[in-house]
Swiss-Prot record:
Self-association state and partner proteins as the record states: The cytochrome bc1 complex contains 11 subunits: 3 respiratory subunits (MT-CYB, CYC1 and UQCRFS1), 2 core proteins (UQCRC1 and UQCRC2) and 6 low-molecular weight proteins (UQCRH/QCR6, UQCRB/QCR7, UQCRQ/QCR8, UQCR10/QCR9, UQCR11/QCR10 and a cleavage product of UQCRFS1). This cytochrome bc1 complex then forms a dimer.
Gene Ontology terms describing biological process: mitochondrial electron transport, ubiquinol to cytochrome c
Protein source organism: Muntiacus muntjak
Function noted in UniProt: Component of the ubiquinol-cytochrome c reductase complex (complex III or cytochrome b-c1 complex) that is part of the mitochondrial respiratory chain. The b-c1 complex mediates electron transfer from ubiquinol to cytochrome c. Contributes to the generation of a proton gradient across the mitochondrial membrane that is then used for ATP synthesis.
Family: Belongs to the cytochrome b family.
Membrane-crossing segments per the record: 33-53, 77-98, 113-133, 178-198, 226-246, 288-308, 320-340, 347-367
Annotated CDD domains: cytochrome_b_C, Cytochrome_b_N
Pfam families documented for this protein: Cytochrom_B_C, Cytochrome_B
Note: Heme 1 (or BL or b562) is low-potential and absorbs at about 562 nm, and heme 2 (or BH or b566) is high-potential and absorbs at about 566 nm.
Binding site for heme b b562: 83, 182
Name of the protein in question: Cytochrome b
Length: 379
């Protein structure tokens, strides 16, 4: 008799995706982050569900309801901090996952890559609206500053901002709709992730060499299930280290002050995972220019397949491109640091130089370097 996992309509889907899936035999730990992102998403949905049971999306009670969760709800504090720090772990995994895709040329799977970029935008939108919900000072002013950027859009900008706010400023209507968005978006992310996997399984996984691995495939289970479980345990270890020892390490102290429209914090800044984009936004003196640079800094990923001029897919055998890749990583870390600094000398000029370097590496230096490496192969 045929095994039920191969015949049952539902189990067959699970079987083909996680059990009998042919996987390359040489994929490294950098390939673990897809499954870790899935775990992060499940964790965020579960902790978020329990938080939503006690949270109230009203300007008068939002801040107190979060305090109530931490003080009065059984294990509310751990659920709240797992959710807040879980977002940080989510973005760490996300950035590594995207970096892996850039390094090993995974962007040549066009559909998978494009869905991935849409996923990145959706996760960033979810994190942004989620940060507004505790209704602290940084929540309120972050929401005001970032939504205000839309007013830079010619002609319809001001109307668009007021439409999103549901009034003439960030207020009760804004908070209520942001809570609604924050609740629905993770389920959209889950659906997109399934489409992402669907397209990936059409082509099969890439591998570190960038060479087709059809001649050497192994079943996903038990090899990669065990490997993913190890990754998951390490992820949970790091998350719980954050939650139990330094829960506020990545947060902003200003968010422990209730939102006050009459008092602006000295330095308005988003969560750490948006700082690189925020630094690029601030490095351009013009408002519309800054908004375009901000969007371009992420949207540029869509054009990676067009900018790929190398005859090899992966960077593993291309030392010049490797150097550029790691300079890009260092540049992004520099931008993250600058995004958290006040707007004054020397941070302004460092931010501008780092922003120029970011676009220069991706749009100019990487394609040129790849062409040079192609010519070196002929020698």
């Amino acid at each position: 008799m045929t095994n039920i996992r191969k015949t049952h309509p539902l189990m067959k889907i699970v079987n083909n995706a996680f059990i009998d899936l042919p996987a390359p035999s040489n994929i490294s730990s950098w390939w673990n982050f897809g499954s870790l992102l899935g775990i992060c998403l499940i964790l965020q949905i579960l902790t978020g569900l329990f938080l939503a049971m006690h949270y109230t999306s009203d300007t008068m009670t939002a801040f107190s309801s979060v305090t109530h969760i931490c003080r009065d709800v059984n294990y509310g504090w751990i659920i709240r901090y797992m959710h807040a720090n879980g977002a940080s772990m989510f973005f760490i995994c996300l950035f590594i996952h995207v970096g892996r895709g850039l390094y090993y040329g995974s962007y040549t799977f066009l559909e998978t890559w494009n869905i991935g970029v849409i996923l990145l935008f959706t996760v960033m939108a979810t994190a942004f609206v989620g940060y507004v919900l505790p209704w602290g000072q940084m929540s309120f002013w972050g929401a005001t500053v970032i939504t205000n950027l839309l007013s830079a859009i010619p002609y319809i900008g001001t109307n668009l901002v007021e439409w999103i706010w549901g009034g003439f400023s960030v207020d009760k209507a804004t908070l209520t709709r942001f809570f609604a968005f924050h609740f629905i978006l993770p389920f959209i992310i889950a659906a997109l992730a399934m489409v992402h996997l669907l397209f990936l399984h059409e082509t099969g996984s890439n591998n570190p060499t960038g060479i087709p691995s059809d001649v050497d495939k192994i079943p996903f289970h038990p090899y990669y299930t065990i490997k993913d479980i190890l990754g998951a345990l390490l992820l949970i270890l790091f998350l719980m280290l954050l939650v139990l020892f330094v829960p506020d390490l990545l947060g902003d102290p200003d968010n422990y002050t209730p939102a006050n429209p009459l008092n602006t914090p000295p330095h308005i800044k988003p969560e750490w995972y948006f700082l690189f984009a925020y630094a690029i936004l601030r490095s351009i003196p013009n408002k519309l220019g800054g908004v375009l640079a901000l969007i371009s800094s992420i949207l540029i990923l869509i054009f990676m397949p067009l900018l790929h001029t190398s005859k090899q897919r992966s960077m593993i055998f291309r030392p010049l491109s490797q150097c550029l890749f790691w300079i890009l990583v260092a540049d992004l870390l520099t931008l993250t640091w600058i995004g958290g600094q006040p707007v004054e000398h020397p941070f302004i000029i460092i931010g501008q130089l780092a922003s120029i370097l970011y676009f220069l590496i991706i749009l100019v230096l990487m394609p040129i370097t790849s062409t040079i490496e192609n010519n070196l192969l002929k020698w």
